[in-house]
Structures are given as C-alpha cells and as structure tokens.
A protein has these predicted regions:
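Hydrophobic anchor residue at the start of the ABC signature
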Residues: 80
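Catalytic Walker B motif of ABC-type/P-loop ATPase nucleotide-binding domains
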Residues: 91-94
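ABC ATPase NBD coupling module
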Residues: 1-17, 24-25, 37, 163-168
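Short helical segment in ABC ATPase nucleotide-binding domains corresponding to the A-loop/adjacent helical element
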Residues: 28-36, 47, 51, 154
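Conserved ABC ATPase "signature" region
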Residues: 43-62, 114
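Conserved H-loop
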Residues: 120-126
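Conserved signature/switch motifs of ABC ATPase nucleotide-binding domains
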Residues: 65-68, 86
C-alpha cells in the first residue's frame, strides 16, 4: 500500500446520516454533482455515468425525484450511487444503515454484498452491530476504547452469511465477549 496524505476521489465516504443529498437537486443531479466538481462537463457522459451508478443501486427509475420524495433507504442508495459514479478504489462507510428500519437495513446489506462482488471495490464498513459485521465482513476488526485494535479476525464463513450459517454463532459469541471485556 501507499501512505495517504490528502483527500482523493479514489476514497469515498458514505455517512450514517442519509440526509446527505442536496435537496434542490434531483437524484440524477445529486449523483452527477461530484463528477461536475471534478471537471466533467459532457452532458451525455454525465448521464451515462449517473445512469450506470443508479442502475447498480436499483434507482434508475427514480432519477427525476427529489430527496424529499425518497425513503431513507433510497437516499442511502443514492449516496452509494454517488460514490460508485466516481469509481473509487475504497468506499468508507460509517454506520450507513444504523438509522434505517430492519427490513431496509437487511435489503441494503444484501445490495452492498452484490455491489462489492460486482465492482470489486474495497469497502471499509464501520458498525456497532455484530450481526452486520459477521454477515458483511471478510475481515473484522474490534477496536479498543483507547482507539487501538483489540481483535483482527478473518471471516472465513462462506457468503452469503446468515445467522443459520455454520460458524456464525461461534463468531458472534467471540465478538460479543470481546466487546464486553475491559480494555
């Protein structure tokens, strides 16, 4: 790897708050906005890229809607489409599904797994949810209160992972114990 010393479009952040879209822009224009900031002006190319990104998150038919017309899960998928449009090497996700209802969260977890497999992009996913970590992660780090790494464990359970998957219970117990230990 190489040392990261400044921001770059090869690393994109998706935040927990799903109200990160510009309310006066349509879904399509929200996805295109970072591309325009990078200097892309060709309207045909902008449309091609935004359509492809929205297709990946199953929102192409919603491209003319405004953020106030979207559910929380749809807003989060638009944020992911914005990230994908820039073709990053790494997507950093800070508890992106934490404030969503259980059904939407499960759906977006499935969609994230499909995107990860299709796009071959590295996703660094921050969560306090053990189930989410075990189901989504290929490598799971547990942070200590002081900011260090308490555990670093490869997740060898074959994807897709469900609570019924062999090894899920043992892994869940291991992380639950680690989270409740001091230090």
């Amino acid at each position: 790897g190489k040392e990261v010393t400044e921001p770059g479009t090869d690393r994109i952040m998706v935040f927990q708050d799903f109200n990160q879209l510009l309310p006066w822009k349509t879904v399509e224009k929200n996805v295109q906005y970072p591309l325009k900031i990078q200097g892309l002006k060709d309207k045909t190319k902008l449309r091609e890229i935004s359509d492809a990104a929205l297709e990946k998150v199953d929102l192409l038919s919603s491209r003319t809607l405004y953020p106030h017309q979207l559910s929380g899960g749809m807003k989060q998928r638009v944020a992911i489409a914005k990230a994908l449009a820039l073709k990053p090497q790494i997507i950093l996700m800070d508890e992106p599904f934490a404030s969503l209802d259980a059904m939407t969260r499960n759906h977006l977890q499935e969609e994230l797994m499909k995107l990860h497999q299709k796009e071959k992009v590295t996703v660094i996913f921050i969560t306090h949810n053990i189930q989410e970590a075990v189901c989504l992660g290929t490598r799971i780090l547990v942070m200590a209160k002081q900011g260090g790494i308490k555990m670093d464990v490869p997740n060898t359970i074959p994807k897709p992972v469900t609570p019924a998957s062999e090894g899920y219970g043992q892994m869940w117990d291991m992380f639950n114990k680690a989270l409740h230990q001091e230090g």
